[in-house]
A protein has these predicted regions:
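Active-site nucleotide-donor binding segment shared across nucleotidyl transfer reactions
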Residues: 36-52
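Catalytic cores and adjacent binding grooves of peptidoglycan-active enzymes
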Residues: 14, 50, 55-57, 63-115
Length: 115
């Protein structure tokens, strides 16, 4: 089940890129089937033009309900199923960017050239 850390995130999620929406919902289903866990959206929009969040092409998902091994397994599965299409970037990144470990999910702009 796809859940939101705060109600305003649900409203922001309604604005995300169509492909991103589908990928996040697929992640939610896969996570529920493999690990019997819900998926929680923790961040959508950010007011920083250098961030994919600014363009509604990225969201962050909670990872603390999974072990590190499970997180890496999910990351590998999602990146195989939904390749970003522009190296060295990935669709799903399990990382700590200073605010704690989480999943960053992103899609590239449709006009981006594949590399």
């Amino acid at each position: 089940m796809l859940l939101f850390n705060a109600e305003f995130l649900r409203e922001e999620f309604d604005l995300v890129d169509r492909k991103l929406n589908k990928i996040v919902n697929a992640i939610s289903t896969i996570k529920e089937v493999l690990f019997e866990k819900n998926t929680v959206v923790t961040s959508v929009y950010r007011d920083d033009p250098d961030s994919t969040h600014y363009y509604y092409r990225a969201v962050d998902l909670r990872s603390r309900d999974l072990t590190e091994k499970e997180c890496k397994k999910l990351e590998k599965i999602i990146n195989q199923l939904f390749p970003y299409g522009k190296k060295p970037y990935q669709t799903m990144l399990y990382h700590n960017s200073g605010s704690g470990w989480h999943f960053h999910i992103q899609v590239r702009a449709e006009h981006d050239e594949e590399v």
